[in-house]
Amino acid sequence: MDKVKFSPYETPGKMSYKVGLTGGIGSGKSTVAKIFSELGVPVIDADIIARELVKPGQPALAEIVTTFGREILNAQGGLDRSRLRHLVFTSEALKTRLEAILHPRILQEMKRRATRLSAPYCVLVIPLLVEIAQKDIVDRTLVIDIPDAIQRQRVKARDQLSDTEIEAILRAQSPRAVRLAAADDIIVNDTDLATLQRQVEHYHQKYLFLASQQRN
């Protein structure tokens, strides 16, 4: 997904109603976020912010190097993401240390960007919204749901990961039932793009209404 454009809503005003968009790997979060964006909704994506935070010269990258060693860098001095992913998914302790470095910074930046918006509502894409127990940063939680078998098929086709790597990622995320229990709203992404589009448009109208109620 391209970097979000905040115009024309990047002006001080009443704070936007915040919808937290989450779901497991391969559930279709980026596609749903893109549809919301095409409907004119500002989207703030945690993964995009995370990539910005670990660019060369950023304090977060320096702290990661201090924690993991310089072997975590590639030849150009940037973060070797594949090596980092391997390390954190084979060590719970290293995963926890990485999260302690990145999560507070990501959430702080998401909050900062959200306060600049005057749109009726915005979407905060947070893959680990349920896991980090920070639901209070959003007004409503929208979960993208996908059956387990379809999820594994899509991830394997998209990311070219081994079954072992996929299982490690899934273990690091909340079980499907836990995500669904935390949801205020659910989009089921198990058919085609047209069906997905209709579901997003339905919730778009719902969130416009909820945002108007909050502002009154």
From Swiss-Prot:
Protein name in the entry: Dephospho-CoA kinase
Role description: Catalyzes the phosphorylation of the 3'-hydroxyl group of dephosphocoenzyme A to form coenzyme A.
Catalytic activity, EC: 2.7.1.24
Main location: cytoplasm
Species, as recorded: Nitrosococcus oceani (strain ATCC 19707 / BCRC 17464 / JCM 30415 / NCIMB 11848 / C-107)
Name of a matching Pfam family: CoaE
GO BP annotations, alphabetical order: coenzyme A biosynthetic process
Molecular function as annotated in GO: ATP binding; dephospho-CoA kinase activity
